[in-house]
Every structure is written in C-alpha cells, then in structure tokens.
Curated annotation (Swiss-Prot):
The gene coding this protein: ybcO
Keywords: Hydrolase, Metal-binding, Nuclease, Zinc
Function summary: Based on its fold and a conserved His residue, has been predicted to be a nuclease.
Family: Belongs to the YbcO family.
Active site: H32
Further facts: Encoded by the cryptic lambdoid prophage DLP12.
Species annotation: Escherichia coli (strain K12)
Pfam families with a match to the protein in the record: YbcO
UniProt-recorded name of the protein: Putative nuclease YbcO
Gene3D superfamilies documented for this protein: prophage-derive protein ybcO
GO molecular function: metal ion binding; nuclease activity
Sites where the protein binds Zn(2+): C13, C21, C54, C57
Domain of life according to the entry: Bacteria
Amino acid sequence: MADLRKAARGRECQVRIPGVCNGNPETSVLAHIRLTGLCGTGTKPPDLIATIACSACHDEIDRRTHFVDAGYAKECALEGMARTQVIWLKEGVIKA
C-alpha cells in the first residue's frame, strides 16, 4: 500500500472545522481517527482510518484544543475521512 502519511502532506485539509481550520496545506498531515476498539494508549488505528487535516483541525479532533464539541469534531473528522478516501481512490493511491 502507498505511504498515506506522505500522501497527506501538503494537501488541502479535508476536515474543515468552521472557525478552526487554518486552511494552510503546509501544515497538513495524516490525522488518525480514534475509534473504540481500533486504538488505545500508544496505539493508532490503521492509516486508512484517517483523514488529511491541517494542524488546527488535527489538534481539535485529537482534543488538544476544545473550540467545538467533541461529537462535532468527530463528525467533521469522519466526513474528512470519506473525502480523503475519495481523493485517494481517484488518484489510485488506494484501491476499492
């Protein structure tokens, strides 16, 4: 599989939390989405369970900041994961 962490760098943020997103692709990284049963202390989910996120949205979905409700941050992250996967499918980075 492609290196999704490298593929995420320099891309437009797909999380796009209103009032939080910095819109700066230079800060974008692969942000893993924490889901019960897929991660724990010191364990990240697989790279497919992630989204392209700017540093500000990444901080919010990882709850290092608390500008929006946690449930809304997770909703934005899951929508971002869907957008990220569609981008990578179209580019052939991942396969269906």
